[in-house]
Amino acid sequence: PGILIIGFPMPGTIDTTQFRRILSRNFALPLIVGALSVAVFVGITAYLVHVLNLVEHTQRVISNTNETAKLSVDMETGLRGFLISGDESFLSPYIMAKARVSDDLVMLKELVAERPGQVDRLRRVESAQRQWYVFADEMIALRRANGDFVTPVSSGRGKILTDDVRREFKDFLEAEQTLRQQRSETAKSVITWSVVAY
């Protein structure tokens, strides 16, 4: 009765090497796969956030450009009202917008600084806008002095300058809208691949 046999494992016991192998297979491997999965998910999420920030940045540029172009139109409208009526109150939109347009163009150049083509377009906008300022200031001076402002206006010089400003704004906006579309498509693609991958 009660004989103890040494050296033989008891039924249902496992040696420590075999236990560690089973433990690593059933615990460590899923843990590693889970950690890699989390790392990939975090990477995809970070990239998606980056792409969405680029879309938002481009939208901000488009919005600011539209506002600046509107100010340019306000200046033209104010000038026209003053030339027709001689009423100085028509110049208030011109004066207010003129001060803001230059600052807005500087800000836009900073927003697109990483894209030299867009910076060049904004420089052309600035150049065309400065030429229009010279024309507008000449017309204002002539109107205030009761001089002949009709002949220079009738020559179409102001319209040509205004059309130049509008064309440059249009080209700039088209490039930004194309970029926004590309970035939006990239974001959609990242979302699609993320969903498919998981």
Residue ranges of predicted features:
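Positive-inside N-terminal membrane-insertion signal
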Residues: 1-32, 193-194
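Juxtamembrane amphipathic/coiled-coil helical coupling segments that flank
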Residues: 11-19, 42-56, 76, 136-198
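Amphipathic alpha-helical segments and their boundaries
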Residues: 23-75, 112-129, 152, 183, ...
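Heptad-repeat alpha-helical coiled-coil/4-helix-bundle sensor or tether segments in soluble regions
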Residues: 71, 82, 91-179
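Short loop-to-helix capping motifs
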Residues: 86-88
